[in-house]
Regions:
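N-terminal basic/disordered segments at the start of proteins
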Residues: 1-25
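Conserved ATP-binding subdomain of kinase catalytic cores across diverse folds
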Residues: 22-36, 67
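A generic beta-sheet turn/junction motif
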Residues: 8-10, 123, 135
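Conserved beta-strand core positions
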Residues: 4, 13, 74-75, 129, ...
Length: 291
C-alpha cells in the first residue's frame, strides 16, 4: 500500500509518498516547495493573501501528483502557522474547496511526538533530546528509554524569529538572550544527553559541516555547531550559498534558525549532536503504515 503525507509548515510545504518494506518505511517520492505561509503573520496573527495564494497553488500541484501516482490514501497536516493564525479555518476551507484535501492541524504535543518517532530511526541511543526547528515553531522533546517523557512546542521558528529580531542586520545579542530565557523555562532539560536535530535549517547545517547530503545518523560535536554558527553569522546573507553550500531559499533564516540549537546545547552541556534526515512526515507515515 502506498501512502502520502503532506506537511504544511510556516516556511515549506512538503509531500512524501511511502510504502512499507521489510518492516521499514521506504520513501518513493518527495516534493518540497518553499511557500513561507507565515510571511507577514506578525502581531495581528492573520495569514496574508499572497502567501495563501502561493501555498494553494502548490496544494493543487500536489493533488495532481497524487492522481498521477495512484495514491488514494493520504494525510495532510499543518503546524505552527495554522495553530497561530486567526483566519486558519478560512484557508483550510479554501484548500478543501479547490483540491479536496483536508488539513489536520497538529497540536504541539503530537508534533513533538511524531518528530521523536522520526528521530528514533536515526539514533543508536535510547535516551536523548530531540529538537525540530521549523519555520514557525520549535519542538523539543526528551526521550528516556525510548519513551517521550517531556515535550515543548514554542513559536521560535526560523521565519518568525527572523522577522521578530532580524539578527543579521541588528546583531544576535537580543535573540540569543531571548532563546536562553525561553529554554530556562524548561526545567526538565537537566541532563547531559545526546541531541538529535531535525528540520530544514538543520539540513543546511549538516551540508555546511559535512559537505554532502548523506548526513542521517551522523554525529558531530557541539563545538562544530558553535563554530559553524559563528561562520554563518559573520558571512553576509548573499554569500552564504556559495561559501557554505546553503540553499539560497534558507540563507536569510539561518542565524535565527540555529539559535534554538545553540541555546539547547549550552543548556544541556552535552557535546554530541546527531543529525536526522527525517521529520514529522515520516513519523506519521510510520504510524499509519503500522495500522
Amino acid at each position: 500500500m502506498k501512502l502520502a503525507v503532506i506537511d504544511l509548515g510556516s516556511n515549506s510545504l512538503r509531500m512524501g509518498i511511502y510504502e512499507k518494506e521489510n518492516g521499514k518505511i521506504k520513501e518513493l517520492k518527495r516534493e518540497r516547495h518553499q511557500v513561507r505561509l507565515a510571511e507577514g503573520l506578525g502581531a495581528d496573527n492573520m495569514l496574508k493573501k499572497e502567501p495563501m495564494e502561493r501555498t494553494l497553488k502548490v496544494f493543487e500541484s500536489y493533488r495532481q501528483v497524487l492522481i498521477e501516482e495512484n495514491v488514494d490514501n493520504f494525510k495532510a497536516i499543518a503546524t505552527e502557522s495554522l495553530r497561530r493564525a486567526e483566519n486558519a479555518s478560512e484557508f483550510i476551507k479554501c484548500v478543501k474547496l479547490f483540491t479536496g484535501i483536508d488539513i489536520d492541524v497538529l497540536d504541539g504535543e503530537n508534533e513533538a511526538k511524531y518528530g521523536a518517532a522520526a528521530a528514533k530511526m536515526s539514533m543508536d541511543a535510547d535516551s536523548f533530546y530531540v529538537i525540530d526547528i521549523g519555520g514557525g515553531s520549535v519542538e523539543i522533546a526528551k526521550v528516556k528509554e525510548g519513551v517521550v517523557v517531556n515535550y515543548s512546542s514554542k513559536p521560535l521558528g526560523c521565519v518568525v524569529m527572523t522577522e521578530k529580531f532580524n539578527p543579521d542586520e541588528k546583531g544576535d545579542g537580543e535573540i540569543k538572550a531571548y532563546m536562553k530565557q525561553e529554554l530556562e523555562e524548561l526545567e526538565w532539560i537537566n541532563e547531559s544527553l545526546p541531541v538529535c536535530v531535525l528540520g530544514g535549517v538543520v539540513k543546511e547545517l549538516a551540508v555546511s559541516i559535512l559537505g554532502n547530503y548523506d548526513f542521517d545518523g551522523k554525529k558531530i560535536t557541539a563545538d562544530k555547531v558553535f563554530d559553524m554558527y559563528d561562520k554563518i553569522y559573520k558571512t553576509k546573507v548573499p554569500e552564504r550559498c556559495e561559501k557554505f553550500g546553503i540553499d539560497p531559499r534558507r540563507c536569510d533564516v539561518m542565524t535565527a534558525g540555529l539559535c534554538p540549537l545553540t541555546a539547547l546545547l549550552k543548556k544541556t552541556g552535552m557535546g554530541q549532536v546527531v543529525f536526522c534526515a527525517r521529520g514529522v512526515r515520516e513519523g506519521i507515515a510510520m504510524e499509519l503504515l503500522d495500522e
